[in-house]
């Protein structure tokens, strides 16, 4: 079993349980419990972030920006930053060319791990992200991700889940520690 598969099973079970209990909309907060998500954020700051998210009529999802750099390239999709499946591209090239594995990892992964100072806006629009925790506005039409058993190591379950939402943002000032 892969970590991705375990995460997808947990997310799907949670959605199955609470989906019928949602009336208009609810806040859904999935999180990776194997990360220290609150090292840089106290409870008051997190509560304020949730309140700001609820009040933001344009947003359907908020995600943190990890420190010292954004690490979750696997779940990230943003034009000009990560346009496709960087991990899969790196893996395919490393299988063809044994020498130079670090170069492929650098090109497809490490060079995409930006620091928050690269961005001006407080809310960075993305097609998909995660980074250990997310805030979502959901209603009872929410669907869960069907894991493709053939691609379970190279497809982030967050990307398929995030396709249900139009306005997703990485919050520049919501910091978590990169693993």
Model-derived features: positions:
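Alpha-helical elements of Rossmann-like donor-binding domains used by nucleotide-donor carbohydrate transfer enzymes
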Residues: 9, 13, 44-48, 160
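Conserved catalytic core of nucleotide-sugar-dependent glycosyltransferases
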Residues: 35-138, 142-146
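Generic structural signal for helix capping and beta-alpha/helix-loop junctions
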Residues: 71, 177-178
């Amino acid at each position: 079993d892969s970590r991705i598969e375990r995460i997808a099973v947990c997310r799907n079970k949670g959605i199955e349980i609470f989906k019928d209990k949602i009336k208009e909309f609810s806040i859904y907060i999935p999180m990776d419990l194997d990360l220290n998500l609150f090292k840089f954020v106290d409870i008051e700051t997190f509560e304020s972030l949730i309140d700001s998210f609820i009040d933001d009529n344009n947003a359907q999802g908020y995600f943190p920006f990890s420190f010292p750099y954004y690490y979750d390239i696997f779940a990230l999709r943003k034009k000009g930053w990560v346009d496709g499946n960087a991990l899969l591209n790196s893996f395919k090239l490393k299988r063809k060319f044994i020498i130079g594995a670090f170069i492929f990892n650098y090109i497809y992964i490490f060079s995409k791990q930006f620091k928050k100072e690269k961005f001006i806006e407080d809310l960075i629009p993305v097609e998909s992200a995660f980074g250990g925790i997310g805030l979502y506005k959901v209603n009872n039409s929410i669907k869960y991700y069907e894991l493709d058993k053939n691609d379970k190591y190279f497809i982030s379950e967050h990307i398929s889940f995030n396709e249900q939402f139009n306005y997703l943002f990485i919050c520049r000032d919501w910091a978590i520690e990169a693993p």
